[in-house]
Amino acid sequence: MKLEFKKSISNKVIIILGAMFVFLFLLGYFLLVGIDKVSNVTPEMFFFSSYTVATQFGLMLFSFVIAFFINREYSNKNILFYKLIGENIYTFFYKKIAVLFLECFAFITLGLLIISLMYHDFSHFALLLFLFSAVILQYILIIGTISVLCPNILISIGVSIVYWMTSVILVAISNKTFGFIAPFEAGNTMYPRIERVLQSDNMTLGSNDVLFIILYLVSIIIINAIVLRFSKTRWIKMGL
C-alpha cells in the first residue's frame, strides 16, 4: 500500500483526483445557478445537484485518472518488478483500488464537510457520504477491471465509455429488467427516491435501497475477482 501511495503522489494522481472533486462540486452549484436559474441555492439542492453530476458524468470525469493509475504500469513495463517483490494480480489490483478509494473518500468527506459547514446543516451528511462513496467505488472497480484487461489507457477509457453508454441505454429501455446494471442512473427508480429523502427530514434511505447498493457493489467485486482469476497470464504478458 505504501508503494501505491507514493506512486499516487509522484504521478500527481492525488492532485488530479482533488481537482476532479472540486470541479464536481462546483459544477453541481453552477448547474443550479447558471442552467436552472436558482437564486437561493439550498443545501439539499446543492448536494443533490452534485450527486447528479457524480452519477451522470462521473465515469467520464474519473475514467482517465483511474485507467492511468493502472495502465501506466503496463506502459512502463513494471509488472515484472511487481512479481519480483512478491505481488500477484490480486494484490496488484486491490492495493491500487484501495489507494484510489481512500483518496477519493478523503476528498468526498472534505467536500461534504465544507459545504455542510457553509450551510450549518449536517442532517444528511452520513447518507451523502455513503452515496458518493458508493458511486465512486463502482467507477473505480469497473474502470479498474477494464484497465487490467486493456493494453493501454486510450482503449481502457474507450471501453469504459462504451460500457457507460450501454448501461444508460439499457436502463432507459427497461429499468425493471436492466436496473441492476446501473442503480445510480437518473432513469432508474432509486434516483427520485434519493431526491425525496434529501428534501425531507429522513436521515437515510430505506433499508431495501441500502441493501440493493451493497449487493450491487459486492456483485461487482465478485465479477472482478473472476475476471482477475482468468487474467493472470494476460496481466504478465501485457507488462513485459
Curated annotation (Swiss-Prot):
Its main location: membrane. It is found in: Cell membrane. The keyword Transcription does not apply. Keywords: Cell membrane, Membrane, Transmembrane, Transmembrane helix. One of its GO terms (cellular component) is plasma membrane. It is a multi-pass membrane protein. Disruption phenotype: Up-regulates expression of the LiaRS two-component regulatory system; this effect is more pronounced on modified competence medium than on rich or sporulation medium. Induction: Transcriptionally repressed by rok, this was not found to be the case in another study. The keyword Transmembrane applies. The chain crosses the membrane at residues 13-33, 50-70, 97-117, 126-146, 153-173, 210-230. The complex is composed of 2 ATP-binding proteins (YydI), two transmembrane proteins (YydJ). Suggested to be part of an ABC transporter complex YydIJ involved in export of the modified peptide YydF. This is Probable peptide export permease protein YydJ. It comes from Bacillus subtilis (strain 168). The lineage of its organism: Bacteria, Bacillati, Bacillota, Bacilli, Bacillales.
